[in-house]
Amino acid sequence: MAAPVVPSELLDPLIEWLKIPSVSTDPQDPVPIKEAAEWVQEKITAAGGTADLVDAGGNPLVVGHFKANKPDAKTVLIYGHYDVQDPEPLGLWTTPPFEPTIRGDRLYARGASDDKGNFWPLLYAACEMAKAGELGINVRVLCEGEEERGSRNTNDWLAADNEPTDACIIYDSGRMGRAAAITIGGRGIITTRVTVRTGERDLHSGLFGGSVPNAIHELTRVLTHVLPGPDGILRDELRAGIIGAPAAERERWASAIPGEKLIELAGGTPLSSTSGDRYYEQNFWEPSLDVDEIRSGSPRTVIPCEATAFISVRLAPEQRNEDILSALKDVITSVLPGYASVRFDDDAGCDAASFDPEHPVLLAARRGFTRAIGEECQLMRIGGTLPLLDVLAKRGIPTVLTGFATLVDNIHGPDESYPLESITMGAAGGRALFEELAKL
């Protein structure tokens, strides 16, 4: 089968943008960060809009605006991010991460799916409609450079923003098969860095092995008290506040791709015999805890006096991030032996967010996507977290979280890619979405 054809005016700029190594995770280079932001700014102004690079305390925010072709039009905010994850390990890439390459029906590059390749078609649709005088809504553009670092500055900026906004569209999610999908909710999150210390300095294991505590040993013992059980379920203190999935959601799971298949497609291994059956409940309506990183020691046969773990907990709807972070710290502190100390750093978190699928904005989006893609638009949840959603929900802004990523895009990993057809689907869907929202 021939690869889908993407118009050059849609594909070529994306390839240009993907060549910019706008890595925001440490260590970051401010030059490509600014270059990627200026790329977005130039695209907006070239289409007749206005755009500024705003200093919100970190990497520049691109804040743009396209005026509607009629008075008293509604205002819609579109959001994306220009920053990307570190591409290491480079040796696992088939082609260099910042040399975009088409192989088969996919475009390979860091950021191809998350989020440059996903967001650009939406921005492209706004630019093209603005140039043709076809925008029946005011479009505000917010494109940030710190999403991969938690979006703290962006969240603060958006929470303080007082511009009237009737809806928000976010292209940073995925589709279901060939159908567009709208995400009506995601989980919350807490993160913290836990450091256990057992002495003043590292000591020689030949002189003190078995006589003094090893910080790695103590950290791992502590972690066993907060890790999930063999079925993936967390201890009661970390499950406080969960409400379970409503009947309507459970009915949707019956027609969804089986959990076992999703795990297989992603290249994972089921944790237990029930992981497939419980996939949707576990990832949408239950909390989960992961140790994402452990740092300590060296191969020098010394006993480390300090060990650090980075822990993340995905929160179920209705769980409060402050409560679960406090419970996590209480458990860790309570099981620590008297000869060790613990420190918590870099605490962060946000609550889960949900949006009413029957809101007029979401109904309009569903109509637009169904018309543009030719398949009935689906509703879904995600197990991930977009901190911006919490801010938007608290501001009462109905949000269409969508996009055209797929399960096999390998975001954040080597050989990240994006289907060529997703690029054209995203542009067509964006145009239809703007048209339907203009009718409200």
Where are these regions (language model features)?
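Active-site metal-coordination/substrate-binding segment of hydrolases
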Residues: 73-143, 425
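A generic structural motif
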Residues: 113, 200, 313-321, 350
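A short core secondary-structure module
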Residues: 209-231
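An extended, acidic, His-containing surface patch that forms the Zn2+-binding/catalytic region
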Residues: 71, 85, 151, 177-178, ...
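N-terminal helical capping/dimerization or prosegment-like subdomains
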Residues: 1-90, 306-310, 322-325
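Histidine/acidic-residue-rich, glycine-tolerant segments that coordinate divalent metal ions
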Residues: 136-214
